Each structure stands twice: as structure tokens, then as C-alpha cells.
């Protein structure tokens, strides 16, 4: 009996060590860099133009969902990048300022374009969330109430 308990404790420690395995910042950055490299390769073969960063986000999401990449392998670097996102957008802001003469040619059209694209994004997001709710990916209260009386 004591041997079984000790074996169980050793197995639990091994599982805990795997869960708490720490990855260095270099390893985490390398993981993200490899995903971005793969997304750049995919981008070069795609018939429609799509940014490699968007492809990389989708690849990272799929890798996290399937368990190919563990959250611990990208969490610290991902959090650091998210915390400094404002600083990372500075080059984009500078390029907009450099393009100011082009933007001055039709400011009303640009403002109208921003408003329309924002509304389209909101509408698409709303329809997508409604689709997810109706397709039972997120169970509604009615289904939970129907199944709750079965067990008891």
C-alpha cells in the first residue's frame, strides 16, 4: 500500500513538473519567430494578399488549441508584446504622418471609409457571435435546464 502511494506521489510530481516547466524568453521568442516564419512562407504561396501577421495569429491559435504549442511556451513574450503594443504601433503612426499630403486630398472620403468599415466590422462581429450561439458552441440556459432534471 505504501509503495502504491509513493508511486502515485512520484507520478504527480512528474505531472506537476511538466505543468510548471519554465521556458526562457529566448525559447518563447524563438517559438513565435518560427510561427511567423511559417506564416511568411504561407503568405508567399497564397493567391490573395493576406498579411503574414494575421496568418501567424491564426497559426498560433490553432497550435495552442491543438496542444502543439503550450501556453507556457509563448506566455511571457506574448504578454510583454501586448503590454508594449502602443510602442510597437509608433512606426505605423509615423508612416501615416508621412502620408499626410495624400490624406489631405480627400479627408471626407477617408472619414466616410473609416465609419463604414467600422460599422461593417461591428455587423459582422454581431452576426458571427449570433451564429456561434445558435450553433450550440456556447450552450444556452434552455439546454442546461433540459439536461439538469435528467441526472436527478
Swiss-Prot record:
Its main location: membrane. The gene is lrgA. GO terms for biological process: cytolysis; killing of cells of another organism; programmed cell death. Disulfide bonds: none annotated. It comes from Staphylococcus epidermidis (strain ATCC 12228 / FDA PCI 1200). Keywords: Cell membrane, Cytolysis, Membrane, Transmembrane, Transmembrane helix. It is found in: Cell membrane. GO terms for cellular component: plasma membrane. Inhibits the expression or activity of extracellular murein hydrolases by interacting, possibly with LrgB, with the holin-like proteins CidA and/or CidB. The LrgAB and CidAB proteins may affect the proton motive force of the membrane. May be involved in programmed cell death (PCD), possibly triggering PCD in response to antibiotics and environmental stresses. It comes from the Bacteria. The chain crosses the membrane at residues 23-43, 45-65, 77-97, 108-128. It is a multi-pass membrane protein. InterPro entries: Antiholin-like_LrgA (IPR023736), LrgA/CidA (IPR005538). This is Antiholin-like protein LrgA. NCBIfam families: PRK04125.1. Belongs to the CidA/LrgA family. LrgA subfamily. It holds the Pfam family LrgA. HAMAP family: LrgA.
Amino acid at each position: 500500500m505504501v509503495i502504491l502511494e509513493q508511486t502515485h506521489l512520484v507520478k504527480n510530481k512528474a505531472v506537476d513538473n511538466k505543468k510548471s516547466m519554465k521556458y526562457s524568453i529566448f525559447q518563447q521568442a524563438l517559438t513565435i519567430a518560427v510561427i511567423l516564419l511559417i506564416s511568411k512562407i504561407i503568405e508567399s504561396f497564397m493567391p490573395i494578399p493576406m498579411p503574414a501577421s494575421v496568418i501567424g495569429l491564426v497559426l498560433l491559435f490553432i497550435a495552442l488549441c491543438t496542444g502543439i504549442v503550450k501556453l507556457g511556451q509563448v506566455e511571457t513574450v506574448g504578454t510583454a508584446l501586448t503590454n508594449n503594443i502602443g510602442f510597437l504601433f509608433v512606426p505605423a503612426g509615423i508612416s501615416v504622418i508621412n502620408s499626410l499630403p495624400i490624406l489631405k486630398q480627400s479627408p471626407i472620403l477617408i472619414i466616410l471609409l473609416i465609419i463604414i468599415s467600422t460599422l461593417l466590422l461591428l455587423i459582422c462581429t454581431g452576426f458571427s457571435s449570433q451564429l456561434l450561439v445558435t450553433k450550440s458552441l456556447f450552450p444556452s440556459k434552455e439546454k442546461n435546464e433540459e439536461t439538469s432534471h435528467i441526472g436527478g
